[in-house]
Amino acid sequence: MCGIAGVLSASFLPNGIEEILKQAGSAIAHRGPDDVGVWVDKDASIGFVHRRLSIIDLSPAGHQPMISATGRFVIIFNGEIYNHLDLREELEKSGRAPNWRGHADTESLLAAFECWGVEATLKKTVGMFAIALWDRQDRKLILARDRMGEKPLYYGFFGGLLAFGSELKALRKIPGFKGEINRDVLGLLMRHNYVPAPYSIYHDIAKLPPGTWLEFTPEILNRKEKPVPFVYWSAKEAALTGVADSYQFTSDTEAVNALEKTLKQSVSGQM
């Protein structure tokens, strides 16, 4: 488990943005006690903070925020990509792999985004994750969440400033945070015992739905638009496809064996 947070401005970043990001990171330090990283590009009016819990690559090569081999992309990422070695192998076979600096899944993810783009990479990726990706070339911020929404990702608009984070605690440290309770959501909280996406307990702060990604640019912030998430995976569509393509087992034993095989494959990919 790691923690991420960041801001994107339509004009200028607040004064002392590095310290603000450090405070946002400190608010979620329990998510990543091993390392902290801050990256700010004042010319692009964007800043990231990452709290790291080292799991796969324990070396400094896994430090975040991480910049891609070409320098085009900057990423902060919370979670784990279970098939990142498969992604590396596919990149290497295509001849488009970079010179690997380490063996972190973050680096694999960055190289995949650079090679295949956002949507194709998300569809190939198996894991639990919340991602913030800055495209320096197109001046575009991507926020993405895993298929089942295992890793949280909140975002909100504070004037001309977009802020996002793994937890609401991080957003409370951003200038302009109001903390006004969304009373319309209280009914959902009482009914489900949690606040479902795309809502949060606060006005003007949303939770990115599972299996989706968002694009933000300074122009979008200037127009005060609220972009609609792109869906790269849907549980409902997956279920309908499964029913349509269902295999007709000849016995209960055959069905049980097939289920056991599928579960073993799924669990082994996470070991």
Where are these regions (language model features)?
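Cysteine-centered catalytic environments shared across enzyme families
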Residues: 1-271
